[in-house]
Amino acid sequence: MAVRASFENNCEVGCFAKLTNAYCLVAIGGSENFYSVFEGELSDAIPVVHASIAGCRIIGRMCVGNRHGLLVPNNTTDQELQHIRNSLPDSVQIRRVEERLSALGNVTTCNDYVALVHPDLDRETEEILADVLKVEVFRQTVADQVLVGSYCVFSNQGGLVHPKTSIEDQDELSSLLQVPLVAGTVNRGSEVIAAGMVVNDWCAFCGLDTTSTELSVVESVFKLNEAKPSTIATSMRDSLIDSLT
């Protein structure tokens, strides 16, 4: 299901949280209410962890991850890294990355199988991304925007892209990602989709300003109405992909 939330009256929930199928990171902040919204929906299935990255609360923009791993920028402190390591499942690999484009969440986006990255991302970062997150990496733009991590959000079920993405681009991206895509907005018309929402295979959190129409589009494209945490479907898809590669 899709839920509305805000972080200290700020609707950009995608800046203050990072959600995957294996864990959820939530910014350290004055608003315990924000954390409890996530915990109420997710705590039965995955760990919900208070964290900061490089002293910042905008953790959703600073890191990139999926159920296999998490990449954080090089200026993440040892203490922060250790806290995240201790809080996440053992199966999740965590790695610091030396990258000029250090707001990794703005320049990369991924699900458990595929990643889109900024055209100028460092080659070494691309290799680390493929290795740690176990994804296939594509250098792309979304609606001519290089910040793919800001203007595109997708799970293993579907994706939402910048509203000005052409039909041709949507089709191309959809065939790369192997999920259906819809052009849309969150937070009453915001084009910066990834700043306004986070999603995994069974749950989405959008900013408080998100209209009911936007929310129903999110529930529809990410197939959230019939979704629940499922290891069976995940392992079936994994074995299918292994047999094809």
From Swiss-Prot:
Known role: Binds to the 60S ribosomal subunit and prevents its association with the 40S ribosomal subunit to form the 80S initiation complex in the cytoplasm. Behaves as a stimulatory translation initiation factor downstream insulin/growth factors. Is also involved in ribosome biogenesis. Associates with pre-60S subunits in the nucleus and is involved in its nuclear export. Cytoplasmic release of TIF6 from 60S subunits and nuclear relocalization is promoted by a RACK1 (RACK1)-dependent protein kinase C activity.
Family: Belongs to the eIF-6 family.
Tissue: Detected in bladder, duodenum, liver, esophagus, pancreas, adipose tissue, megakaryocytes and testis with lower levels in muscle (at protein level).
Pfam families assigned: eIF-6
Cellular component, GO annotation: cytoplasm; intermediate filament; lamin filament; nucleolus; nucleoplasm; synapse
Phenotype when the gene is knocked out: Embryonic lethality. Embryos die at preimplantation stage.
Modified-residue entries (Phosphothreonine), positions: T165
Protein name stated in the entry: Eukaryotic translation initiation factor 6
Residues with the Phosphoserine modification: S166, S174, S175, S235, S239, S243
Keywords assigned: Cytoplasm, Initiation factor, Nucleus, Phosphoprotein, Protein biosynthesis, Ribosome biogenesis, Ubl conjugation
NCBIfam families: eIF-6
Subcellular location: Cytoplasm; Nucleus, Nucleolus
Main localization, broad class: cytoplasm
A GO term, aspect molecular function: ribosome binding
Gene Ontology biological process terms, A to Z: cytosolic ribosome assembly; miRNA-mediated gene silencing by inhibition of translation; miRNA-mediated post-transcriptional gene silencing; positive regulation of translation; regulation of fatty acid biosynthetic process; regulation of glycolytic process; regulation of megakaryocyte differentiation; regulation of reactive oxygen species metabolic process
InterPro entries: eIF6
Subunit structure: Monomer. Associates with the 60S ribosomal subunit. Interacts with RACK1. Interacts with DICER1, AGO2, TARBP2, MOV10 and RPL7A; they form a large RNA-induced silencing complex (RISC).
The UniProt record lists the keyword Hydrolase: no
Post-translational modification: Phosphorylation at Ser-174 and Ser-175 by CSNK1D/CK1 promotes nuclear export.
